[in-house]
């Protein structure tokens, strides 16, 4: 992993919280309705901290971008990477074609349904656009099932139109199955919560992965930000 740009650390938090506490709790936290010092988050940080203390994350990840974080995978020093399908092409070009696979983020509590992360990119018309009529036609064109499939294939993503043909890429096929069978979808920490909250929260997550023994101080600091932003 490379956490220099923070959002990759948030992916770990999201998945762990979704697996431990479920979607409703997670979104309540994203909406600012739940404290970051809530005891239900203790297990999330316990599991995460245990991984960090045992050295399961590469060293110096806070100084690496997610792109630079691919190097340990390519040179054989790392075995797994929590990352979107868009990384597959890079790994294959680096010599791992036929040598990598995919598995769903593990279940932690069998009583909690499997919610997944599936951030969705969207295209919009600016409110002050001069030619909205043609812009709407272009959006309609982009939304067509066949066009969605073309765009998704180039980007290494899944199409958002459920009428689009099934993807041919083996990893996208598995991803499509996982998302289709999930209880529901979260977008991602920095999309699901207030932008300022996300920035401060992700800074805390990155610090926690480096210094898990600072958990209490980090959560207290993040909680202070939550109270200021959401006034709850």
How would you name each of these model-derived features?
Residues 1-33, 49, 78:
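Extracytoplasmic/periplasmic solute-binding protein
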Residues 20-43, 93-94, 107-115, 166, ...:
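Short, solvent-exposed loop/beta-turn-alpha elements that line the ligand-binding surface or hinge
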Residues 31-61:
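Glycine-centered hinge/linker elements that transmit conformational signals in sensory
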Residues 54, 93-156, 203:
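Extracytoplasmic/periplasmic substrate-recognition and gating elements
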Residues 60-74:
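Short helix-initiation/N-cap motifs at beta->coil->alpha
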Residues 66, 83-88, 119-121:
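Beta->alpha turn/N-cap motifs
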Residues 75-83, 98:
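Alpha-to-beta junction loops
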Residues 180-232:
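Conserved C-terminal helix/tail region of periplasmic/extracytoplasmic solute-binding proteins
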